[in-house]
Amino acid sequence: MIGKWKCNCMIGRSIQGMVYGIYVGDELRYIGSHHGENVQKRYSQHMTNIKKDKHKFIKSSELSKVRFEVLCNVFSDSFMLEFVEMLYISLYSPKNKCIANGHTYKACKESDAENSLRALEKQFILERWDNQDIKYELCM
């Protein structure tokens, strides 16, 4: 479990999105992102795949232990939503994916994930940081 850390992030022009986690018991198995306010639709898509045993990381036999939780609300553009999602993936290394080569998610070494995140951070800082009004709030 990530603990009690939750965040709200607002940068630049605003769309609403969220980074969410799917837990089996206290184990974080999946981190994903979703644009829009209706997170229940995305949750029901995951649950349908789990029930049909089509989900790669959660089996239908574990359905009673499955918990869906919003980890971070993002009020920004798509780039920031992806950045926050990659940050959570890098920090908590769920089974679903690892950061490698930008938007390509695949199994990789932890050092590859860290290097990709550092490159993304540098790109973010150089191209966007100076021109944005930033509000970042951690909620416990």
Task: Locate the predicted segments by residue.
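Structure-specific nucleic-acid interaction/processing domains
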Residues: 1-136
